[in-house]
């Protein structure tokens, strides 16, 4: 039988209405249900839908999905609705959620009710939509799978608002005299049909963060009620009349927002609507969005803001040259560009240009800068103007789209047509205007605050398909330029890998795409079924699992992609064990089972969820490692001091294969995004900077140790002493958001490790040193120039390295890159000249290279720079380098094979980061340039009686 489900992923796990471990089942466009899997309760039955909000849906941090619409049934209590009845009376059982399965197009939800005696009853519920005389109904079909007897009978206690119930039909069940409990037989069906939604019902606001809630606040706080009421026409139409008349889509939101701001007459009569010029476009859009929601029409899908349009950045030079000379009547190709530094008062737009002059100018062929950083060293706190003419060969209507991060304004022929002001991410604003034949004067104003930036001016003939406004239409004359203030650019290194990121793949590896071009996975986990099949999970709105066949081909378009599961809650770990597939969701370890051999997952079996959770968006679960019969995973913490007493967060945990045991191995982690087994068999974890974590780090996990983060279980751990990491990763210099480590044991890189980075991008390499039993080491740049920030690194059965990328809003991305990637790296056996290892000596530091240094190179103390500093954990977010000290090099000593350099240094201290920079460009005997010039060594323990060799 075919069922009319309203959405593709109609069964999905998430937080819902600020409650964790929820399962939403969208049975029909007129009936949604949601189950609380901790209590086993049917939480809600409603007509409406879901506000898909949060990092994987809208990139917004801090919010989670919420329901909207009319509730027929709602039970927000945490006490279970289930009872077990026996000869001894009735008891409240322990609830053990077992999982759910798909059965002939329906979903079965499995629970175990456990008595105090240890006996239990296993029950499956299949919910379904039904219709009776035009009334929506919920059919709940229960099957007792195991354990029920005359001595142990399941009873479902639930109450309903009888005013909302049209009729109820019980089959195989008997309702108690109190009208609440229903005693279930082995097979029971409860059919409940609901009365229509009351005509006077208005959609309640179920959240306080979305556009509906914000719009309602603005409307209620404005003067709109002088002309409009909710359900009655006044001077203007009633809000609900507007909602019924117009479609709830983004185009209508934009049209109504412009009408609110600009005023004028429309389709409701001759009385003009008052203009509200002081209202921001964002507020007007929120108001329009709220008004259009009042007829309970589903919200439009997230507005797609494609700033890149698969088109490269249109780059141009900015300089301090005076371009004011020349004939103002002589029009030249391109738009005139002026760049201003924002003043201390923070003025922008006309307020800024009236008070100061630009520092740089240039000529832009077109206006398309989706990648932050392409303007050179100035990346924050600036203002730009693009000025000139748009030439049109005819009078024509065009829809302009201005996308900017942060704010922007577009003026055409003296009129402001787009207002995209404000500090925000990449936001698109459209305006349909007429271009006159000939020269159309324009001014585009752009302001950049902090963080990344982006800007693109696009247009369309039909308002649907947009392209970058081409360089063939832009012109300027000399009048567009102003006098410049003096400006001297900073002198910076221009050599990739020399105090700046690399820009390419490591020469010892060849990179291939491990996915077809039209497949855009935001990788949460990677593993392999066999040598022919890769399996991945994706951290996105779908929460999917895919099989990739032929993944190691050199023709990525021939790779076959098959979705086998979906509806998982932010999965960030996946593992094949003994031919069985396991995935780590945000709040559960789950076994995925294909029962009929078609590779599509039929059963989502809970293995374990025996750790505390809340609805906080930052409670990620990362994994997975499997060794010696157990899984190992990491649990991220909540953020903010109000969550100091949340237990079980910030832990490395061991989970037995059957899920019956959960053991805390170590604690004190913040965002431990990645866990792996190292070359010595120990577990290694990448943790991210934040409160109590002054900078990111790689940790070698030791049982029972505490690694610094104190906001989880505050009272117990607040006085704990922090154990040191394997390596500190200085923020911005070598790391921002480190991710899953992996062993590197190929070519000259024996028993080393690598890890990705979501925000800094690329892959880093770690050499592990050991001093008196203490593991410590050095970190190096390794691979860069990838499609996205790297979230997972895994070696395949073919001996190749696979790296999966991810991205989201804010700083959860590698700036200027995509939000998805899947790369394959094949070792090509070519040698790369770089630092292979750095070892601590009692009298200095020894650097080992992969190749001999060229005999023509003269190594002296001027070729090196060495510093040391330390970090201190505080409650503040991150922390600065402390005690920064330049170290004097006494001598530089080259080994006889010219592959090792020993720097004789006095004054190196324990518990410091020792930074070494090779200032002088050097080459190898093979005439290769040095791949990267820096390393950061974590000196937890300084060796004694392990001197480096000082040449006579």
Give the ranges of each region predicted by the language model:
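Acidic, Ser/Thr/Gly/Pro-rich low-complexity segments and short DxT(G/T)-type signature motifs
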Residues: 829-837, 854, 918-952
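Axial heme c-ligation environment in periplasmic c-type cytochrome domains
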Residues: 235-246, 261-288, 294, 299-300, ...
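Beta-propeller blade termini and top-face loops
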Residues: 369-375, 486-828
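Electrostatic cytochrome c docking/interface patches
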Residues: 198-220
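The canonical Cys-X-X-Cys-His
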Residues: 219-231, 273, 287-291, 545, ...
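Extracellular/secretory pathway-exposed regions associated with glycan biology
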Residues: 305-399, 403-506
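Short, surface-exposed alpha-helix to beta-strand junction/turn motifs within ectodomains of secreted
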Residues: 852-891, 916-923, 933-937
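Beta-strand-rich N-terminal accessory domains
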Residues: 1-126, 130-132, 137, 157
